[in-house]
């Protein structure tokens, strides 16, 4: 006779609606799921994980002698039209004597099983930790105090007792629904410390997103946040974010070319290498506070020294000559190129350097009105542009981890 109990014995962890919550209790449960969240391979057909440390997830409820178990491979699939498609494997941790391989002794060879043990663990003993009932307990966030898996694996950062938002990067905040007896013994971190960890994790994840696009909403937020925290999004002019360029006072850096191109101008990237970080500005500046009718004004005076033997010293000097009080000027070897797309504003200058829509006949030049115009797109200009962007010797220059300063705690 078929029994309904048979459906409960499955190798796959039951679906989890809420993540996070209390530490695994010392008494086991009737479920068959891992207490911990999974580690996930980054590629299909990856080799079993190797660990920098013991490979046993942190669990303060257990003695050192009980810190041993195994990681078990779980094949994963996602539904596609007409069937399913394999995705990189997940690996779940179980204590020795529990879970799908409960009948194995520590060290027994079996495909898809990796045995791990902490230093001083009694691997001959079997655990009474049990497995997790997903209807009663949430997955516990992974922590490895002595080192986690190798670089071929990842896992979502879940702060303890934090709420989820979107895809799994935070734990459920359903702690208030837990039994009071567990609430009192849980959570040794303060709320502010958890906030800091969550923010740090988000920063790391954001920095690891290669090739991520900046949406219009994000760009608008970058350009209109508090003035001292603004950054120039792609496609924005300098004066759209920081106001018109001036001479002899604040906002005096940038010539017309830099203003038009924004962060596309290679000189911006070069000069950001010399701009102090937030901490350097605060603790390395001469800070002058002044009360004004509109509020408190803070003035930061900071000096960056570029040694004369710096390989790019001459380029820095050249950029400063061009851009300090540079409003209304352009580099001598630069000519505004004809716009490839229509402009909503008609040209007002009578000495326009190039006729409209002159793609096929490049040799046709405007009448001799400005000798500098004829020098556009020469090899000299290309050489100068290459120098300004410092593409020749990237190993000489350290552009810093975050030149735009977006991800600062």
UniProtKB/Swiss-Prot annotation:
Primary location group: virion
Keywords (A to Z) from UniProt: ADP-ribosylation, Disulfide bond, Host Golgi apparatus, Phosphoprotein, Ribonucleoprotein, RNA-binding, Transcription, Transcription regulation, Viral nucleoprotein, Virion
Organism classification: Viruses, Riboviria, Orthornavirae, Pisuviricota, Pisoniviricetes
GO MF annotation: an example: RNA binding
Region (Dimerization): 226-333
Biased composition (Low complexity): 15-31, 164-179, 341-357
Gene field: N
Task of the protein: Packages the positive strand viral genome RNA into a helical ribonucleocapsid (RNP) and plays a fundamental role during virion assembly through its interactions with the viral genome and membrane protein M. Plays an important role in enhancing the efficiency of subgenomic viral RNA transcription as well as viral replication.
Phosphothreonine: modified positions: 378
CoV N NTD domain mapped to chain residues: 31-156
Modified residues (Phosphoserine): 190, 192, 379
Protein's name according to its UniProt entry: Nucleoprotein
GO-annotated cellular components: host cell endoplasmic reticulum-Golgi intermediate compartment; host cell Golgi apparatus; ribonucleoprotein complex; viral nucleocapsid
S-S bridge residues: 320-323
Subcellular location as annotated: Virion; Host endoplasmic reticulum-Golgi intermediate compartment; Host Golgi apparatus
InterPro entries the UniProt entry points to: N_prot_C_CoV (IPR044344), N_prot_N_CoV (IPR044345), NCAP_gCoV (IPR042547), Nucleocap_CoV (IPR001218), Nucleocapsid_C (IPR037179), Nucleocapsid_N (IPR037195)
PROSITE patterns assigned to the protein according to its UniProt record, in alphabetical order: COV_N_CTD, COV_N_NTD
Family (UniProt): Belongs to the gammacoronavirus nucleocapsid protein family.
Assembly information from the UniProt record: Homooligomer. Both monomeric and oligomeric forms interact with RNA. Interacts with protein M. Interacts with NSP3; this interaction serves to tether the genome to the newly translated replicase-transcriptase complex at a very early stage of infection.
Annotated Basic residues bias: 358-367
Maturation and modification: ADP-ribosylated. The ADP-ribosylation is retained in the virion during infection.
């Amino acid at each position: 006779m078929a029994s309904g109990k048979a459906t409960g014995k499955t190798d796959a962890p039951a679906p989890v609606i809420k993540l996070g919550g209390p530490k695994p209790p010392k008494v086991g449960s009737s479920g068959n799921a891992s207490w911990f969240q999974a580690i996930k391979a980054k590629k299909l057909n990856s080799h079993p994980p190797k660990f920098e440390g013991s490979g046993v997830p942190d669990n303060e409820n257990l003695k050192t002698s009980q810190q041993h178990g195994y990681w078990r491979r779980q094949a994963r699939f996602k539904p596609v039209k007409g069937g399913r498609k394999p995705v990189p494997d997940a690996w779940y941790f179980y204590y020795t004597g529990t879970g799908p391989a409960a009948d194995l002794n520590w060290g027994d060879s079996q495909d898809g099983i990796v045995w791990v043990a902490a230093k001083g663990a009694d691997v001959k003993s079997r655990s009474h930790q049990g497995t997790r009932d997903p209807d009663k307990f949430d997955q516990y966030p992974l922590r490895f105090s002595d080192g986690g898996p190798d670089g071929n694996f990842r896992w979502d950062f879940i702060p303890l007792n934090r709420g989820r938002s979107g895809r799994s990067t935070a734990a459920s905040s359903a702690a208030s629904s837990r039994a009071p007896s567990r609430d009192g013994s849980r959570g040794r971190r303060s709320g502010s410390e958890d906030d800091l960890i969550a923010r740090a994790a988000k920063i790391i994840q954001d920095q690891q997103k290669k090739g991520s696009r900046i949406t219009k909403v994000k760009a608008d937020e970058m350009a209109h946040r508090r003035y001292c925290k603004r950054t120039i999004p792609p496609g924005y002019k300098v004066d759209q974010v920081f106001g018109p360029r001036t001479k002899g006072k604040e906002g005096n850096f940038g010539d017309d070319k830099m203003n038009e191109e924004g962060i596309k101008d290679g000189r911006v990237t070069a000069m950001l290498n010399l701009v102090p970080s937030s901490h350097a500005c605060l603790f390395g500046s001469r800070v002058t506070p002044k009360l004004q009718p509109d509020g408190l004004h803070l003035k930061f005076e900071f000096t960056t020294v570029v040694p004369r033997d710096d390989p790019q010293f001459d380029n820095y000097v050249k950029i400063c000559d061009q851009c300090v009080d540079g409003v209304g000027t352009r580099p001598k070897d630069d000519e505004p190129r004809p716009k490839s797309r229509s402009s909503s504003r008609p040209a007002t200058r009578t000495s326009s350097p190039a006729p409209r829509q002159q793609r096929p006949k490049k040799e046709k030049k405007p009448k001799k009105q400005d000798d500098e115009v004829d020098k556009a797109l020469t090899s000299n200009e290309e050489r100068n542009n290459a120098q300004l962007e410092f593409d020749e010797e990237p190993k000489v220059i350290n552009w810093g981890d975050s030149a735009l300063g977006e991800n600062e705690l």
